[in-house]
A protein has these predicted regions:
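Active-site-adjacent segment of SDR/Rossmann-fold oxidoreductases
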Residues: 124, 145-156
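Active-site helix of classical SDR
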Residues: 99, 135
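The beta1-alpha1 cofactor-binding region of Rossmann-like NAD(H)/NADP(H)-dependent oxidoreductases
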Residues: 36-47, 81
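Conserved mid-core segment of classical short-chain dehydrogenase/reductases
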Residues: 69-85, 128
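A glycine-rich helix->loop->beta "capping" turn
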Residues: 28-31, 51-62, 70
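C-terminal helical subdomain
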Residues: 159, 176-215, 231
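Residue(s) in the substrate-gating loop at a strand-loop-helix junction
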Residues: 119
Length: 265
């Protein structure tokens, strides 16, 4: 990830898992401030907003990156409504709380940029990820409304429809060890591009193609996505079959995943 030492004081919110990456920023001459918060907690969000406002006068750029993903078909989710509640609480309400809390500071400074890390799954309507995709789609819908309201206030909004990235979030799904994914550096470069150019949306060609097919040929899109749904089954845990041995991906699965690089299966 390229780092340039402008007069910036990044404030990072998260757990200790990313501490090893801070050295790169510090070596570039940036002053890093870290804060720990549970974004799904209203109290933590409110406290974080207060801290950022009092200590730094708010923020110029907010990147909503925290997220929870659940890979489970709807038929295996009938008794797991809490999956939908948990994804909404973090991916939508948590991001919304932070954004709403920090927007007044951007308004007073007459500048700001909100970058929301969404998913390619919103563009492709990825099956087996209904809880995750719905929560990301909710944030996208709110972002479009907000962008229209603040278009004349020098506050920009960017949505990044991130493809599948090789991070600890996908590690429970062993299938992803065999399919092509973005590296964390490649994902970070998309965020850097958003900061520099302030696009309304950043998406891969596959994501844009998926959205076009869903808009212009919805039945064809459903057939394609149903094919992927049947080709890549739920994990044993998601299907309530704990203890069954993990099955390595077939040649057909690997070939399909290579063609659809970055897609959620």
């Amino acid at each position: 990830m390229p780092v340039t030492a402008h007069r910036a004081h990044p404030a990072r919110v998260g757990s200790d898992r990313g501490e090893r990456g801070l050295g790169e920023f510090e070596a570039a001459g940036l002053t890093i401030h870290t804060h720990s918060a549970d974004i799904a907690s209203k109290e933590d969000c409110d406290a974080l907003v207060q801290t950022l406002t009092e200590n730094y006068g708010g923020v110029d750029i907010l990147i909503n990156n925290a997220g929870r993903s659940i890979r489970r078909g709807i038929e295996n989710s009938f008794d797991r409504f809490h999956d939908f509640e948990r994804t909404m609480e973090l991916n939508y309400f948590g991001a919304l709380r932070l954004t709403m809390g920090l927007l007044p500071g951007m308004i007073s400074k007459q500048r700001g940029h909100v970058i929301n890390i969404s998913s390619i799954g919103v563009l492709t309507s990825a099956p087996r990820f209904s809880a995750y995709v719905a929560s990301k789609a909710a944030m996208e819908a709110w972002t479009r409304c907000a962008a229209s309201e603040f278009a004349d206030r020098r506050i920009d909004f960017t949505t990044i429809n991130m493809p599948l990235v090789k991070t600890p979030m996908i590690s429970p799904t062993k299938l992803y060890e065999q399919v092509p994914t973005l590296t964390p550096d490649e994902a970070a470069n998309l965020v850097v591009d958003a900061i520099i150019h302030k696009q309304v949306r950043i998406a891969t060609r596959l994501g844009i193609f998926g959205a076009l097919v869903h808009s212009l040929m919805p039945k064809v899109a459903q057939i394609i996505m149903n094919t992927s749904f049947r080709m890549f089954p739920d994990s044993a845990a998601a299907a309530h079959k704990d203890g069954e041995p993990h099955q390595p991906p077939s040649a057909d699965q690997i070939a399909f995943a290579q063609i659809m690089r970055g897609m959620y299966f």
